[in-house]
Regions:
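Short N-terminal or domain-adjacent regulatory/targeting segments
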Residues: 1-25, 71-76
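Flexible, glycine-rich loop/tail regions that form catalytic "lids" or insertion modules at the edges
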Residues: 20-22, 31-34, 76-78, 88
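Residues that mark the start of a beta-strand
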Residues: 27-31, 59-61
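Long, low-complexity, serine/threonine- and charged-residue-rich intrinsically disordered N-terminal tails
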Residues: 32-37, 43-44
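Residue-level recognition of beta-strand->loop/alpha-helix junctions
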Residues: 34, 64-68
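Short helix-loop-beta junction
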Residues: 49-61
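Glycine-rich beta-alpha loop elements in corrinoid/cobalamin-binding modules
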Residues: 67-197
């Protein structure tokens, strides 16, 4: 990580009033990503609520990622400067259609394959959510292992519990993890559903 990125991260953190308590020993690490700049992402109430809900769960610890304002040589969390591939879940909070194009760009910056079908390992699990899921998640379905439909606050605890238990089991089968996640109300797993083309 270059010094410009380190300086940028520290400037943002120094301006914030910390309201979140982190569970540093949490078993499920979440990279919470917003596919727009820091200022746009931090003005999203939904993004902030999800960040709080995740960090309030006893098994979870979430750090934030934003689309780089300047093209840094990679993608790193605001809190610790960790790349997204080191997390169990990469969760995208998507509010606007114009942000769709930044999702594969952010995955590329994090050295994460774009499509769910290209990611064989169960982790990091790439999940989408936000207002886009209220009307039509299909344009982004191929990118995500799972999509949270509707209000995330009601679904996240179950998701974290499933991932926590899966990790404890020592299982490495991504297919089984996706089946387990698909049993949670409000979660859509595109790989387990047929896609239709015109």
């Amino acid at each position: 990580m270059d010094w410009e990125l380190t300086k940028w991260r520290k400037e943002r953190l120094n301006r914030e009033k910390p309201l979140i308590t982190f569970f540093h020993g949490a078993s499920v690490r979440v990279a919470l990503a917003y596919p727009n700049t820091y200022y746009v992402g931090m003005s999203s109430l939904g993004f902030q609520v999800v960040y709080d809900v995740l960090n309030s769960h006893k098994h979870a610890s979430a750090e934030r990622f934003f689309y780089p304002e300047h093209m840094f040589k990679g993608l790193f969390s605001i809190e610790s400067g960790t790349p997204p591939g080191n997390y169990d879940i990469i969760g995208f909070s998507i509010s606007f259609e114009l942000d769709y194009i930044r999702i594969p760009q952010m995955l590329s910056l994090g050295d994460i394959p774009h499509y769910s079908s290209q990611r064989e390992s169960p982790f990091p699990l790439v999940i989408g959510g936000g207002s886009f899921s209220f009307y039509n998640p299909e344009p982004l379905a191929d990118f995500f292992d799972a999509i949270v439909l509707g209000e995330a606050e009601e679904t996240l605890a179950g998701l974290i519990d499933v991932v926590h238990n899966f990790k404890l089991s020592g299982n490495k089968d991504k297919g089984q993890l996706l089946k387990d996640i698909s049993n949670i109300d409000g979660i859509y797993v595109p790989a387990l559903h047929s896609h239709f083309s015109c």
